[in-house]
């Protein structure tokens, strides 16, 4: 691939970088200046920014600012520079931080002390690097960091392995690389770069620049890379990658050192061996001391004597206070920290106040304050890879996944904006410019509330979100919290005061933008004499307030706006209205049994096999076996108990393997052997008795408290007597009202002769109704039942009793009914249809007409092609809206899918006359009133 470019020359101000420092395009750098140097730099634009060529360059690269500067690397005789845009000047107490963002390369034609004529070449194409070598480099980096930090190797039984690990840590090159590559901004950038190169598509020129900026390549290679063009630049880049791979694979291989170390035991006596090792260690310590002296951290004044600075235990705090201007800390906070440190120096170290104040300053120093002189890499997160990561971790949960992808898309667009913040220059009385405060970030992290029953994966989804974003993860359990100081921190006047849980999470994660999970927020303590912790959450979770969150222990504002808060709850309505209003609610429904089968095969079984020490093919379970466990051994919306059962089977297989009698296959008949008898034996029907007449029994559908659906049998028996209805079976208030509506509606139909037939037939029905005492019972009387969705079931049950006409056992129904016979929509359609399917005998279900949209949503939810799903969803909704306007119904793809998947025929009913026509296929009809009301 060739490199084509157009070039033009422009005169720009010059900023010469410190020694061995180099800027690269696409990276944001923050550099600390003293105030006079910053003013000198700003004053150079008074004439330059009016240049037409400068304006043309700014326009060509999409820059809203014309404040361009040629940043010359800190390397002798450099004829190359990086053209940067100055995003802003940020005033500190004694210094000024200038934010540069690299725009493009420049080649110096002529220069003096303050200005340079720079030739800018705009490249339109750059050859792609060898991504295999890139992936190899990232693998080497991961292996090196993992091995270097592995404390477990020090306890290894292999003496040679222990020696190799210790010698690696003694290697200066390894120590320096670990320090640089472990930095939070560098590690996050490398992680995103690995994902970007793994896609084998994208802006590789930008990715290459970011990698050269992140990795500590030699300055000669960096200069050569900056200077080169087109295909030559790729050659230099490949040399950089080859150099880094050689460092990890050869120079950091301590096997040879370990051999020499162990050979001391064989080539000399034990005493001589110990002497050699002692000399090695003493030489290291001596040279380390010289290095410390070279850095100016220690001054030796004479043999055996040290200065007071050597014994100053507050040296680290002093260094932190001296460098406060390099951190993004509130100005009031900087003043308070400096004041407290001055007070600390006046105290006696033996006093209790000294220890309290020192502990406070150490906590402040340990917080991950953002450095203003660090650079910000802007590698975009790959949405396709993020989607793959979320799908690999969790099954379903489409609404939550789509919300995370939306946030990533917005984050990518913010990263692509140039510049991030347009500098705002405010000129005073003279020619010297001053600057405004740093503007707040316009990108606010969303605050999500995942609500749903236990065990559906809310907590693990939050962890997966952190992995996808490449951020640190912290979990805070707020269930039962009854002291607001646990969140806001304790004031330092109290004995044993500590920061709040939010600040502690920042300190543990060493990041100012982690993903923080606030678990079980619906179970947080209520008002007490210690304050209301839920009210404390209002400030934390409000994007307009948490930019200045005030922790009582810290004592000055902290910016929490870049934290991604994810909250979880089981009951959404346990939260107060103000708190609920601050969060984006994402409802996670319980899994149906088909989903549990898929989750078991893809996630639970492989995970439990690994935990049991078995191979991935050591256990084989078919869908029928897994479904049996899900339906007969568990009754839950989530998968926790199901995973425990699978774990028990895997442990049983592990025992069999050790006994030499293991087989792979686990069938339905083997379940009792491994996990015992089912917790409840589900019957497909209550069964008919010998004296049952057959009528007065109807199958309803229920949505259970555990998030599942099931068949619910309604039974009615009539006795001679005055007309009344008794109800048993622990029925709730709403269900009892539905029974009264059913009784009244049937009486109304009979008294008004609305049942089709001869007058003699109608009179007989009315007489039978008026002289029958009805008893309604819903089996499983120990379980309380409530809700309006059994309205048509009870009405049909009473009508069946009066007509003495049997309702087919293969039929089930659900729907609320009104006094006028209208059938209203209900909830839990998805779960109820699955419950009808699992009953084993139902092949036809009556649903309210207005619930067709729920069937459509379930059909769309189960489509794997999300783009196609969105198109079909819009199409079906438009079609459904038109059908409702015309008063028609339609059976299309969603209904066909239900029949193919669950074996259920869906019939939609709009009023009770539709129910009768569908149940008895036209044998029983209503005439007059209700039919006329529909017309």
Swiss-Prot record:
Enzyme Commission number: 3.4.21.53
Catalytic residue positions: 789, 832
Catalysed reaction, written as an equation: Hydrolysis of proteins in presence of ATP
GO CC aspect terms: peroxisomal matrix
Lon N-terminal domain residues: 12-296
A molecular function (GO) term: ATP-dependent peptidase activity
SMART domains named among the record's database cross-references: AAA
Keywords noted in UniProt: ATP-binding, Hydrolase, Nucleotide-binding, Peroxisome, Protease, Serine protease
CDD domains xrefs: RecA-like_Lon
Protein name stated in the entry: Lon protease homolog 2, peroxisomal
Name of the gene encoding the protein in the UniProt record: PLN
